[in-house]
Amino acid sequence: GLFLKDQSLQPQMGTLLAEMLVTMSDRGPDSAGIAIYGDDGEVSSSAAKITLQSSAPHEDFVDLAADVAASTGMDDSKVSLTVKDTHAVLMVPAGMAADVRASLDEIRPTVRIMSVGEAIEIYKEVGLPRSVAERFSVSRMSGTHGIGHTRMATESAVTTMGAHPFSTGADQCLVHNGSLSNHNSLRRKLIRDGVHFETDNDTEVAAAYLTHKMQQGASLGEALESGLDDLDGFYTFVVGTRDGFGVVRDPIACKPAVMAETDQ
């Protein structure tokens, strides 16, 4: 992850993040992904970004903005779509995000939602980190902070949806190095609490657990503290939010974490 103190560096966020991603290629050659948080000039509390993924983008993304507007009763001018390879960012009024998500299930059932929020965009695909970064032109992106991940699959299949980051809450995401041993029991409990899952990946369970805790009123720090008691296994998490990110390791701390701070 990378958080910029120096606002003049925000236009370079994508370049810096892509370089970090490529450097980690040997660690995770199966798939790669990033979450990038838009700079202050791009973020508006009156609009929501919904990042989408499709295995057939030339079909699913055609006329999608107009179809969303029609199905939700919005004016066409309130909806816009920016396509980037297999992903697209749908911009809608913030108060309509939930309606749009429900609409997408009906009008584009094969489209998957990567993230929702005012600032976050998530891009992830199967392939070497350099290839993924080039497909989405990551080096051209700007932002305040970002998180990347290169994957070597251990808990689930090598798929786009199994790649990291995972997002289970507004402007939230999580990447993970390690393996959870109680993710199936936690998944069942969270499902009973109304949480929906897209994959059988253990990392999605960790992300959903933290989101659920925060929706119940916990701060990010409090949610991470609870996770030390409730999440079994070995792990290092980087958790992104609208304002920054947090890092936590399991009590045994067998997975490394390297952190550094500069004036920039």
Which positions does each model-derived feature cover?
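Conserved short alpha-helical segments that host acidic/polar catalytic motifs at enzyme active sites
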Residues: 1-264
